[in-house]
Every structure is written in C-alpha cells, then in structure tokens.
C-alpha cells in the first residue's frame, strides 16, 4: 500500500496509546550521570564544555536579571536538539514537526518575557512600540506595525521550527523513495541518489541543531529587551 509522504508526521499509537511519551523518555535514561571522581570521562567532559560554552554565548549580552533564565534556556535547547536528532532516525516520529508542540513552547515563553517587561519597566517596554525620532504623522502607523510585529513573534518561532524540519524530512523521504525505485532500473543513478541522500542527512543533522539554537537564541533576545 502506498502511503502519503505526510504520514511520517502523524503521531503513532499502539492499542490506542500514543507512543510519544515513551519515545521521549527513553533517550534521557541513556544520558551519562555525573560521578564522584575528580576527573570525568570524555563524554561528560565534552557535554559539560558544550553546555558551558552555550550558556556563555547566550547570556553574555544580557544583564544580571536575565542570567536566572540560563538553566531554562539550556534545558530547552538540549531538549529540542535531542528530539530533532532522534527524528532523523528511520521509522521515528519527530514531535517538533507539529506546530502545536512548537507553539506550546513559543507562546508561553514569549508571553512571559512580555509580561516581565510590562511589570518591571513598563515605560521602556511600551517605548519599543515607537522608535525614537519618528515623525509625528507616522506615529499611529508605526505603533500599529510594531504591535503586529510583537504579537507575530511566537507564531514566527513556531512556524520557523516546524517548516524547516518538515521540509527537510519531506525532501529526505522523496530522495530515499527515488533511490529505492531506481535501484533495479538504473543502479548507477540510484547510487548517486543515495550519495545525495547521505549528504542531505548530514545537512539535516546540522539544521536540527541550528534550529534548536535559533529558537532559544530568539527567545533570549526577546527577554533581553524586557529585563
């Protein structure tokens, strides 16, 4: 039976029970746990170095008020990277291709940054809606434009992550299907197609990590405006 290319984005279930929770919980059990030894192994050292560098790059432009968000942003980025990379494995479901999940991350965090700005420094937060030096006739128009751009931020966060991952998965499935069909008819072309698929897979690994970083980076920039 020929299945739709979009069937890979449907949530799988067994006996009516969704398997997303099990698929998400298993990888975290495989993460190494810290030891009491003075020197950690190579994997723990690499993991600690990566987390420290990410926190430094993300929190360096912020003031002290935004540093308390370091743990939340780091956990969110590691969570997104893990899900995105696991979604590249064959016969796996990628939850971050669902707009509902991405919006569930983007909307509350964006709204939190806006509310922090409104409560802590309402004058500065409202001042972002009107650039300095704006001519008087353009004030109403710019306020409307800036307000729309403010409320479209969480939608842009969710759609960006969903669209990039969905497009990559669809392209990989199309190329893999073409390589499988051409295997018996034109083996040479099928080999070249498989090589393209291998290179695209490497690219998608990079995209999976970059998109998780961009998602958290944009949230940190929104927070920086309001802290």
Curated annotation (Swiss-Prot):
SUPFAM superfamilies: F1F0 ATP synthase subunit A (SSF81336)
Superkingdom in the source lineage: Eukaryota
Pfam families recorded: ATP-synt_A (PF00119)
Subcellular location: Mitochondrion inner membrane
The UniProt record lists the keyword Transmembrane helix: yes
Segments passing through the bilayer: 14-34, 69-89, 99-119, 139-159, 165-185, 190-210
PROSITE patterns hit by this protein: ATPASE_A
Cystine pairings recorded for this chain: none
UniProt keyword list: ATP synthesis, CF(0), Hydrogen ion transport, Ion transport, Membrane, Mitochondrion, Mitochondrion inner membrane, Transmembrane, Transmembrane helix, Transport
Catalytic activity: H(+)(in) = H(+)(out)
Membrane topology (UniProt): Multi-pass membrane protein
Single GO term (MF): proton channel activity
Record GO cellular component, one term: mitochondrial inner membrane
InterPro entries: ATP_synth_F0_asu (IPR000568), ATP_synth_F0_asu_AS (IPR023011), ATP_synth_F0_asu_bact/mt (IPR045083), F0_ATP_A_sf (IPR035908)
GO biological process: proton motive force-driven ATP synthesis; proton transmembrane transport
Function, as annotated: Subunit a, of the mitochondrial membrane ATP synthase complex (F(1)F(0) ATP synthase or Complex V) that produces ATP from ADP in the presence of a proton gradient across the membrane which is generated by electron transport complexes of the respiratory chain. ATP synthase complex consist of a soluble F(1) head domain - the catalytic core - and a membrane F(1) domain - the membrane proton channel. These two domains are linked by a central stalk rotating inside the F(1) region and a stationary peripheral stalk.
Quaternary organization: Component of the ATP synthase complex composed at least of ATP5F1A/subunit alpha, ATP5F1B/subunit beta, ATP5MC1/subunit c (homooctomer), MT-ATP6/subunit a, MT-ATP8/subunit 8, ATP5ME/subunit e, ATP5MF/subunit f, ATP5MG/subunit g, ATP5MK/subunit k, ATP5MJ/subunit j, ATP5F1C/subunit gamma, ATP5F1D/subunit delta, ATP5F1E/subunit epsilon, ATP5PF/subunit F6, ATP5PB/subunit b, ATP5PD/subunit d, ATP5PO/subunit OSCP.
Record-stated family: Belongs to the ATPase A chain family.
Record-given protein name: ATP synthase F(0) complex subunit a
Organism: Scyliorhinus canicula (Small-spotted catshark)
The gene coding this protein: MT-ATP6
């Amino acid at each position: 039976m020929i299945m739709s290319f979009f069937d890979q984005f449907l949530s799988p279930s067994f006996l009516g029970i969704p398997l997303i929770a099990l698929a998400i919980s298993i990888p975290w059990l495989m993460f190494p746990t810290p030891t009491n030894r003075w020197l950690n192994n190579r994997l723990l050292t690499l993991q600690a170095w990566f987390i420290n560098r990410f926190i430094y790059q993300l929190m360096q432009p912020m003031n002290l008020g935004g540093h308390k968000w370091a743990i939340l942003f780091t956990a969110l980025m590691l969570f997104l990277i893990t899900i995105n990379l696991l979604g590249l494995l064959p016969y796996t479901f990628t939850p971050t291709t669902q707009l509902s999940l991405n919006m569930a991350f983007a909307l509350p965090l964006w709204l939190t940054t806006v509310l922090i700005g409104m409560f802590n420094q309402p004058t500065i937060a409202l001042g972002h809606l009107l650039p300095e030096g704006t001519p008087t006739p353009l004030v109403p128009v710019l306020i409307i434009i800036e307000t729309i751009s403010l409320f479209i931020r969480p939608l842009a966060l969710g759609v960006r992550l969903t669209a990039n991952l969905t497009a990559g998965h669809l392209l990989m499935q199309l190329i893999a299907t073409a390589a499988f069909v051409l295997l018996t008819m034109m083996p040479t072309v099928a080999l070249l197609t498989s090589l393209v698929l291998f290179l695209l897979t490497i690219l998608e690994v990079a995209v999976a990590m970059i998109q998780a970083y961009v998602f958290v980076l944009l949230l940190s920039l929104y927070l920086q405006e309001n802290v």
